[in-house]
Each structure stands twice: as C-alpha cells, then as structure tokens.
Amino acid sequence: MTSLNNFKKIIALLSLSVSIVLQAESPIEAQALSVDQAMQYAIRTHPLILSAEGQYRAAKSELAASRWSRFPTVGASAQESSTEVKQDVTSASMPIWMGGRINADIDLAKSNRDGALSGISEAQQSVMLETIGLFFDYFKSEKKLEIASLNVDEHQRLYEIIERRVAAATSPDVDTMLAQARLQSARSAQIQAASAKNITKASLELTVGRVIDAVLVNNSPEPLSIGLNEAVATGIQVSPRIARIESEIKGFEANIKSAKSALYPQVSLGYEKRYNDPDPSRVDQEETFVSVQFQPGAGFAVASSISAAKQRKQSARDSLEAEKRELRRQIKTAWNEYTSVSFQLEPSKMLVDATTSVIESYLRQYAVGKKSWLDVLNAQREATQARNTLVDFEVQYLTSIYRLRVLM
C-alpha cells in the first residue's frame, strides 16, 4: 500500500508543474527543458527503472507459479525391461497438508512481488533525485558561464579605458599591465566555466536520453507549506526503500514458517494406474492412496535453518531502522539547506546590486584621484564574486526544495 501511494505521489509530482512556467516566445525557449520534463524523460528511459520493472514482472510470475502448488501434480512414465516387458504408469498426487510450507512459499512470493513493486518506486525516486542534481548543476554552470562572460566584457571595457588614459599620459603604464592581467584571468575563468557547462550538459543529456538546448527555471518556486516534523513523518511513510525492506521482513517471516514445516509430516492424496503389468493377475491395476512423509533432515539441520531465518529477519529489521535514520538525515539536511538559504537570497541580491554600483562610483573617484586603479579592479572582482555567490544560493535553494518534494 505504501509503495502504491508513493507511486501515485511520483506521478502527481511529474504531472503538476508547481514552479515552471513554459512560454514559447522564441525558438530557444520552445526547446528549453524544465526540471519536471527532465525527470519524466529520465524515468521513461533509465535502465535502472527498466531493470526494476523486469524484476517486478519476474516476481509476479513466481507468485503465479507458487499458487499452482495447491493443485494436483499429474505424471506419466513408461519403462521396458531387458526381457521386452513394457509397463506404463500414470499418476496424480495432490497435497492435503504440508505443514504450512505451501502457504509460506506463497507468502514469500507475495513479499517478493511487493518488494519488487517498491523497487520500481525506489528506482524512480533515485533517478529523480539524480536528475534534479544534474539539472541544477547544469543550470548553475550555465549561469556561471554568463557571469564569466560578463566579467570578461567588463574587464575588456576597463582595459580599454585605462589604455586610453595611459596613451594620454594621465595614468601610469603599470595600470595597463594590471588591467591586462585581470583580463587574462577573467578569460581563463570563462574557459573553465565553459568546460564545466559542457561536462554537466553531457551528464544531464545522458540521464534524460536526449539533446538539451537550454533549461527553463523559475527562480521563485512556491515554498513548502509544511514543517520539518511533518516532512520527516511523510517521507518515512511514503519511502519506497522502507516499503521494500518491510516486504523483505515479511519474506523472512515466510522463510521461518517454511523452515518450521519440516518438523511436521506431509500428507498428500495419490492416484496411480498401471498398464501392461507383467503380472497377469494385475492387468490395468489402479489404486488411490494417502501418502504420509516425514523428512526432518539430517541431525539438527531444521533447527539451524529456523535459526538462520530468524537472524535474517532481525538483520532486516535493523536495516529498516538504519534506513529510517538515513532518511531522517537526508530530509533534515535538505530542510536545513532550504531554510538557511532562503534567508540568504535577499541579502545576496542586495549585495550584487551594491557591488555593481560601486564599480561606476570607483571609476568616477579614480578620475579625480580619490581611488586607485587597483580599487576599481577589485570592485569588479567583488561584483563577480557576489554574482557567483547569488547563483550558488539560488541553485542550493532550488535543489533542496525539489529534493524535499521528491523525498516526501
């Protein structure tokens, strides 16, 4: 049930765009990819999900096969001796009471099926989280390349300004050298930013299975409307990994029952008919009988099997608690990032505006001798750093809010 709820949650998340507004105002925007679309494409083609779906189909077939164990088994045999005496036998047997083994095997198959279904949701969640990270990594690299290009243009402008002043003998030659050094440094940063964009673009394209021209992101998505405790409780309730481990625990309970069935006799109803019996007095003999078999195994093998099944069940319970702790940590980490960054966005925007205006102010003061050329270049560097910091905060905010929505 938990797995089904989680599956519905994933479909709802992908079908409703809570923060993306698509507007086809230009050819580039028409080809832009939103984060919701990226997750849809990744889920549709990712081999991890296809593998999980194959495991689910196999588990369903195994469940169907285990249910047939309740029905009669029909057999036929033919033998011919060295004396050319032929004998044909047809038989049928049906279990009456197997000490609980058949029910245990069916319960095990059910738990495997439920676990495989949860495995699909788990794979989907994993792919979605991976896609979110890659999507916003690409978005960040794209924005940082824009900032790097803007920084190059601004340093080029400053270099031309100081070059004219040096040519007019109103500034020393060292200012030109300093401006040129900063310009080359900006160009190097631009090359690095372009390389980072190409790397993140290739990773995202590999995940979504298509070529990406651009991404479309709304920097002001709808904030979360629940608290931390509710987020943690919801995340645990709908977690597909927790649901899968719970199914494994049920499977180990079935293994315990199956192991205990060896302590009881197995009763079955049989029918057998012989043809061409070598004994003339038993022509076409047929008989119906009740078979009782008791095979507890060698020594204390049954007790050891039961103990092993119980230990595996306890191990799964410990894994379940460990997974709950890990999920709490993930949600709390994403929540803390979401809340802390949300308070830093506005000050960072104000810092960008302030540092940008400082550059022109310093240029005017430099012209009248109140600021040095190094002060002007440092102001430009601080403005670039402020823009990069703002992008980092924006991406961290978007990543955390989308991660929380997927985890919940």
Each model region followed by its residue ranges:
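Amphipathic alpha-helical coiled-coil segments
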Residues: 51-66, 123, 127-150, 157-160, ...
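Bacterial Sec-pathway N-terminal export signals of envelope proteins
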Residues: 24-73, 96, 110, 170-173, ...
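Outer-membrane beta-barrel domain signature
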Residues: 81, 85-87, 191, 273, ...
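Bacterial N-terminal signal peptides
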Residues: 11-21
